[in-house]
């Protein structure tokens, strides 16, 4: 089936519409009573949050209430819709493109697999608009690594779109597009625990990709986030958790929930499904942004560790499947050939030259 670049839905009722019918206090009272709220109510709540309209105590209570009960896909989708409605604009292309991103917070301090995978995927002919931020749990998040490579984080939306057109890859720095996040940051820092904001990052790419490979920090999130992507209108996506990592893993089985035109299938993948050798998690240990830069520079020039190449190849292979290349073994081999050729590193150099 030919894939189209149908835009995930983000144009729904404005948050104020919900507030005309149901007061913010009523929404908060529902949360305090351990009740779920509708997508419209969640959109209204998070619209108020990113406009700075909630007191710190109200915000903290709402976030903890949702966390203790467990966030529902409609609630997460409503929050994402509010953030996307408030995001700075990005000139969305009409061709097929994807994001590859993780929630972070898995605590493994691994190398930047999804960032390396974005460059390899672009060298395989895909278009990747990667949404990223500073580190959540490791010593080096995607944006930390890009800075170490000399890639501009504050590239304009138009220049980023041009890079996507020309190089097949661009990076969108979350704080540049989501200004309202700042209103929640003090409370999030005080709470010192994961909240719904930890899973929102991968769902609010301002380019609104129709395809996505999203890693989550807990296996319990795999199915709910896939359900959320369905609500948001994604065309095809895979949500993964592998052996404690927010990535496709080669050291342990990977749990997958794949969304394909409104249908969700759950399954498990191992290194054998990709025709790859297994490697221990310790072989993927990362370091500072500068150390990770050196590791990935070596990898993307075809001179890296076998474990690093295999980890990236597995993730690129599943990403290729989302574009319609269904054979994971062939996809992994294609990714390895690109890695060994050094083509991916040329894209790093080209992107860093776009000052």
From Swiss-Prot:
Mg(2+) 2 binds at residues 246-247. It catalyses: N-(5-phospho-beta-D-ribosyl)anthranilate + diphosphate = 5-phospho-alpha-D-ribose 1-diphosphate + anthranilate. Pathway: Amino-acid biosynthesis; L-tryptophan biosynthesis; L-tryptophan from chorismate: step 2/5. Anthranilate 1 binds at residues 102, 133. GO terms for cellular component: cytosol. Mg(2+) 1 binds at residues 114, 247. Belongs to the anthranilate phosphoribosyltransferase family. This is Anthranilate phosphoribosyltransferase. It comes from Pectobacterium atrosepticum (strain SCRI 1043 / ATCC BAA-672) (Erwinia carotovora subsp. atroseptica). The lineage of its organism: Bacteria, Pseudomonadati, Pseudomonadota, Gammaproteobacteria, Enterobacterales.
């Amino acid at each position: 089936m030919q894939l189209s670049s149908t835009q995930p839905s983000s144009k729904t009722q404005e948050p104020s519409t919900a507030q005309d019918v149901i007061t913010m206090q009523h929404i908060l009272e529902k949360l305090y009573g351990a009740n779920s709220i509708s997508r419209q109510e969640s959109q209204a709540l998070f619209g108020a949050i990113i406009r700075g309209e909630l007191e710190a105590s109200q915000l903290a209570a709402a976030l903890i209430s949702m966390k203790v009960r467990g966030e529902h896909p409609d609630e997460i989708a409503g929050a994402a819709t509010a953030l996307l409605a408030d995001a700075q604009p990005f000139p969305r292309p009409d061709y097929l493109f994807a994001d590859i991103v993780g929630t972070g917070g898995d605590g493994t301090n691994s190398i930047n697999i999804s960032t390396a995978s974005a460059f390899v995927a672009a060298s395989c002919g895909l278009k990747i608009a990667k949404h990223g931020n500073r580190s959540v749990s490791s010593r080096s998040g995607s944006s930390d690594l890009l800075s170490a490579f000399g890639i501009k984080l504050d590239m304009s939306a138009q220049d980023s779109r041009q890079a996507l057109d020309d190089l097949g890859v661009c990076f969108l720095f979350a704080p540049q597009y989501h200004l309202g996040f700042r209103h929640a940051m003090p409370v999030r820092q005080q709470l010192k625990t994961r909240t719904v904001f930890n899973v929102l990052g991968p769902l609010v790419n301002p380019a609104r990709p129709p395809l996505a490979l999203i890693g989550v920090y807990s296996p319990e999130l795999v199915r709910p986030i896939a359900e959320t992507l369905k609500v948001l209108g994604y065309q095809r996506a895979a949500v993964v958790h592998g052996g404690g990592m927010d990535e496709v893993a080669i050291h342990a089985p990977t749990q997958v929930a794949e969304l394909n035109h409104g249908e969700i299938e759950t399954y498990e993948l191992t290194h054998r499904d990709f025709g790859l050798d297994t490697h221990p998690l310790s072989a993927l240990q990362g370091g500072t942004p500068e150390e990770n830069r050196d590791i990935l520079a070596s990898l993307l020039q075809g001179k890296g560790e076998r474990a690093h190449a295999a980890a990236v190849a597995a993730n690129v292979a599943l990403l290729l499947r989302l574009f319609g290349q269904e054979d994971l073994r062939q996809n992994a081999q294609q990714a390895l050939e690109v890695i060994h050729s050094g083509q991916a590193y040329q894209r790093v150099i080209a992107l860093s030259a776009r000052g």
